[in-house]
């Protein structure tokens, strides 16, 4: 722990020490440390505090005009001095989260090979499939407890970015630390380079990944299996988060491994957890229950269906039957409402089709039922967008919803901002300020008829850092559906709008540490209850969470021999 007051004993010195991001202090090395570690003459004379370093770094940060340049600058600090990076980000979390993660990280992934400065994490390519154990042994961090891994095929709403997808694991793990207090020494970003089907990447002379069409089918599955087994040999207790895998792989991988190892898929389960938490808060603010809602989804991929299943589980926990809950959820994709008998549906979509008996009296304007048809016939009270298709929550759709629902709950969750189904400004205007809105990307508050409406960012960063902290605090062996449900309920209790009747649906990011600790406690307690972690008292659990929570402060160094 960096907040430990005991000194760290360091076996190397000089430029090697300054080149180690986890240990480098830059101008904050004390006079004693400069003498002991052969740093004299390598740094300017003045010894600074970390706060003075933060002030200089922030001044430099503000000098950059574009978000991409700011992203590159912050990544450079991260690769030079991690303690300074996290202190800077924590001091300016609301301002910098959109720079280190969505939406800016999307452009960083698209331009990964062009802005590449220094390697971070592991690039495990298919040609090295027989040497994965060796590659894991080369990782800079040896005591890894949290891994975020992607194959780069479905990066946000931007599609196949090949190894450019590495920007996502790097960004996600930055938030595990900045929001959830997990030491960066315990984290490892990984990209599985199985090629790319993106013609722009393959034709780009700057592209740094394996120039080959994507490996698929049994060869792909065998490669992922070997990776999982190698991780189990190297770090058997590590939490693995699957990130931005394509729909055809995301759910099958989760189903294959969730009962074998400690893992979860943030796109499916994390998105579901934060959405359910936000919905619970919205329902409380509106004076109703989730089980009484009629919910329409635009987007029936793995993320949308994962959210729907989590909502159904919560509705059932409130006392209605599974069949009744499913009858209140309407999944719409490019072909219209998912109905029984539709061809080419995936297994996880089949569970969410509407029965013909539920729609036989509906009116429509063509074959099947469009989103607008569903608005007119089902009269939903909740509308969730996970389509990645901008503008599909049209004025006609929102106004139709508002006709039969005084306080519609509208969540356009697609990332990045360019892919959002509707802007909060439009939704607030079209509903005369009565809609409850949360988005996937950050938006400024909306001013409508003299009133200011703060817009909650329904961002997974409210959930996954707390899940990770809870898992690490009790060394949980699995991440169960019940643990994820508890994370949603814990998040809902933090809602300013639900508690006070004003403010945003979700708490400000400046309170994210308190939120993460509350979620960690709920998740860890459920893990203990389910027998996937050793039993400890509530007091001991709070202590374990506090002990696990890393703070970006410099520790004293003492030199020791190898």
Curated annotation (Swiss-Prot):
InterPro entries: Aminoacid_DH-like_N_sf, Malic_enzyme_CS, Malic_N_dom, Malic_N_dom_sf, Malic_NAD-bd, Malic_OxRdtase, NAD(P)-bd_dom_sf, NAD_malic_enz_proteobac. It catalyses: (S)-malate + NAD(+) = pyruvate + CO2 + NADH; oxaloacetate + H(+) = pyruvate + CO2. Keywords: Metal-binding, NAD, Oxidoreductase. It comes from the Bacteria. The record marks 267 as: Important for activity. Transmembrane segments: none annotated. Its EC number is 1.1.1.38. GO terms for cellular component: cytosol. A divalent metal cation binds at residues 243-244, 267. GO terms for molecular function: malate dehydrogenase (decarboxylating) (NAD+) activity; metal ion binding; NAD binding; oxaloacetate decarboxylase activity. Its cofactor is Mg(2+); Mn(2+). Divalent metal cations. Prefers magnesium or manganese. GO terms for biological process: malate metabolic process. NAD(+) binds at residues 154, 267, 415. The keyword Glycoprotein does not apply. The keyword Metal-binding applies. The active site is at 101 (proton donor), 172 (proton acceptor). HAMAP family: NAD_malic_enz (MF_01619). Belongs to the malic enzymes family. Homotetramer. This is NAD-dependent malic enzyme. It comes from Vibrio parahaemolyticus serotype O3:K6 (strain RIMD 2210633). The gene is maeA.
């Amino acid at each position: 722990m960096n907040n430990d007051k005991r000194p760290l004993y360091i076996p190397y010195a000089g430029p090697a020490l300054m080149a180690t991001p986890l240990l480098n202090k830059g101008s904050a090395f004390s006079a004693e440390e400069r003498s002991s570690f052969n740093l004299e003459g390598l740094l300017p004379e003045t010894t600074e505090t970390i706060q003075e370093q933060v002030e200089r770094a922030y001044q430099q940060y503000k000098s950059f005009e574009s978000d991409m340049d700011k992203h590159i600058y912050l990544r450079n600090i991260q690769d030079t001095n991690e303690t300074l990076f996290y202190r800077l980000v924590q001091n300016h979390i609301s301002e910098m989260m959109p720079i280190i993660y969505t939406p800016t990280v999307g452009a960083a992934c698209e331009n990964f090979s062009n802005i590449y400065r220094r390697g971070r994490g592991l690039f495990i390519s298919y040609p090295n499939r027989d040497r994965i154990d060796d590659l894991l042994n080369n990782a800079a961090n040896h005591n890894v407890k949290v891994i975020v891994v992607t194959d780069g095929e479905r990066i946000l709403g931007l599609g196949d970015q090949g190894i450019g997808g590495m920007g996502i694991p790097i960004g996600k793990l930055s938030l595990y630390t900045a929001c959830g207090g997990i030491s960066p020494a315990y984290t490892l970003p990984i990209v599985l380079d199985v090629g790319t089907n993106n013609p722009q990447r393959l034709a780009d002379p700057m592209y740094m990944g394996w120039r080959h069409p994507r490996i698929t089918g049994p060869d792909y599955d065998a490669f992922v299996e070997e990776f999982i087994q190698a991780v189990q040999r190297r770090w058997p207790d590590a939490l693995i988060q699957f990130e931005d895998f394509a729909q055809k792989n995301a759910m099958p991988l989760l189903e294959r491994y969730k009962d074998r190892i400690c893992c979860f898929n943030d796109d499916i389960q994390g998105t579901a957890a934060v959405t359910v938490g936000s919905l619970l808060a919205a329902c409380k603010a509106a004076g109703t229950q989730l089980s009484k809602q009629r919910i329409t989804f635009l987007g029936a991929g793995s993320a949308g269906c994962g959210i729907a299943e989590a909502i159904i589980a919560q509705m059932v926990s409130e006392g209605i039957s599974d069949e009744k809950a499913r009858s209140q959820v309407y999944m719409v994709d490019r072909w219209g409402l998912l109905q029984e008998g539709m061809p080419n549906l995936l297994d996880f979509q089949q569970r969410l089709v509407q029965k013909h008996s539920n729609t036989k009296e509906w009116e429509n304007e063509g074959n099947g039922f469009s989103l607008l048809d569903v608005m007119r016939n089902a009269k939903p009270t909740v509308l969730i967008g996970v389509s990645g298709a901008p503008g599909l929550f049209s004025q006609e759709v929102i106004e139709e919803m508002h006709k039969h629902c005084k306080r519609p709950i509208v969540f356009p969750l697609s990332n990045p901002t360019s892919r959002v189904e509707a802007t909060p400004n439009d939704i607030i205007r079209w509903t005369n300020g009565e809609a409850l809105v949360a988005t996937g990307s950050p938006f400024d508050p909306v001013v409508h008829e003299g009133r200011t409406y703060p817009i909650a960012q329904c961002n997974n960063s409210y959930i996954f850092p707390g899940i990770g902290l809870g898992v690490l605090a009790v060394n949980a062996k699995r991440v169960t559906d019940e643990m994820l449900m508890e994370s949603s309920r814990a998040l809902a209790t933090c809602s300013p709008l639900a508690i006070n009747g004003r403010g945003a649906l979700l708490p400000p990011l400046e309170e994210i540490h308190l939120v993460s600790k509350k979620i960690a406690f709920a998740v860890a307690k459920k893990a203990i209850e389910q027998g996937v972690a050793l039993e400890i008292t509530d007091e001991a659990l709070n202590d374990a969470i506090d002990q696990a929570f890393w703070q970006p402060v410099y520790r004293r160094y003492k030199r020791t021999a190898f």
